Amino acid sequence: MLLWLFEHLSGYNSSFQVIRYLTLRSLLSILTSLAIGLMLGPVMIRKLQALKYGQAVSSFAPENHAKKMGTPTMGGVLILMSIGISTLLWADLSNPYVWIVLGVMVVFGAVGWADDWIKIRYKDNAGLPARKKFFWTSVASLGAGISLYVIAQNQPNPIHTANMLDLLIPFFKNLSIPLSAVPLGIAFIIFTYLVINGASNAVNLTDGLDGLAIMPIVMVAAGLGVFAYLAGDIRFANYLHIPYVKYTSELVVICSAMVGAGLAFLWYNAHPAQIFMGDVGALALGAMLGTIAVMVRQEIVFAIMGGVFVMEAISVFLQIGSLRMRNKRVFLMAPLHHHYEKQGWKETQVVTRFWIITIMLVVLGLMTLKLR
């Protein structure tokens, strides 16, 4: 929005052309979302307390979680609002990728909000019926996959860059799984669906301790922002042997907004948390990360950088599978962070150590750019 305004004003004063610089707009995006989150955080907390939108604690949760009862939830609304406003202000709104990511954010956020509201309003831990949740998240993720396929079909691949529809294998030059070989983009669309929904649910499973999910979200968003910047510049794409994807540069602005909004939320979500993001935040932010990973064609690297999310999801699958097949537990409790709590780790220890793991994994993900 402001990009259009400043470009119009540059006709009267050339100094306004400075807004065209992506790095400047990305920095402003971080600062804007950070400021919105910090300023509106106390207002959101008081409003949620007045509405009695408090967190319910499961009887199966570790004993030390009882003190979290009644802590305001649905704080993800503030995160998404901060990201949305910052993106609309500083991103190039003629870029289709911007609208796809925002669309995914809105739909998954709405599903998460409905899920949270039903749990609070009706004291029903089941939340939104699974069929409705599956339908709307499928509409959003399949819609994103189809849109990306159509855009890719109208964008020729420059010489020396990888195919933007194939699954890139990190650590190897020019090695990929040819999703583009399947007619009509069926393999690509299905894969996109799995990545977006898998990321959304994995982040949601991780969001169980104060600050546990939001900091890895911030770090992974920053890492994906680097890939978005490089994939959107044909010179870097050629040099690094990654796909050149015309529209990804503007995703840096969105990733920056996610970083700023996430840090602002952490201010109030740090232990002891004053607010939780709820499903409205976790489902939407996870889906956004998955969508951006598909756009920059770095799904495997995304799984590496978001290894904490992957471990949390796998721990749940293993626990459920083992209980059904062997009637035995693999972990003391799932997701994984509760297992360590049961082993005697303090909540802050679990969170800090998972943050350290994420830092190392994000660095490893970035190293794949050169280690080939």
Curated annotation (Swiss-Prot):
It is a multi-pass membrane protein. It comes from the Bacteria. It holds the Pfam family Glycos_transf_4. Pathway: Cell wall biogenesis; peptidoglycan biosynthesis. Its cofactor is Mg(2+). The keyword Zinc does not apply. One of its GO terms (cellular component) is plasma membrane. PROSITE patterns: MRAY_1, MRAY_2. It is found in: Cell inner membrane. The keyword Transmembrane helix applies. Its EC number is 2.7.8.13. The chain crosses the membrane at residues 25-45, 73-93, 98-118, 134-154, 176-196, 211-231, 251-271, 275-295, 300-320, 349-369. One of its GO terms (biological process) is regulation of cell shape. Keywords: Cell cycle, Cell division, Cell inner membrane, Cell membrane, Cell shape, Cell wall biogenesis/degradation, Magnesium, Membrane, Metal-binding, Peptidoglycan synthesis, Transferase, Transmembrane, Transmembrane helix. NCBIfam families: mraY (TIGR00445). Catalyzes the initial step of the lipid cycle reactions in the biosynthesis of the cell wall peptidoglycan: transfers peptidoglycan precursor phospho-MurNAc-pentapeptide from UDP-MurNAc-pentapeptide onto the lipid carrier undecaprenyl phosphate, yielding undecaprenyl-pyrophosphoryl-MurNAc-pentapeptide, known as lipid I. Belongs to the glycosyltransferase 4 family. MraY subfamily. HAMAP family: MraY. This is Phospho-N-acetylmuramoyl-pentapeptide-transferase. It comes from Acinetobacter baylyi (strain ATCC 33305 / BD413 / ADP1).
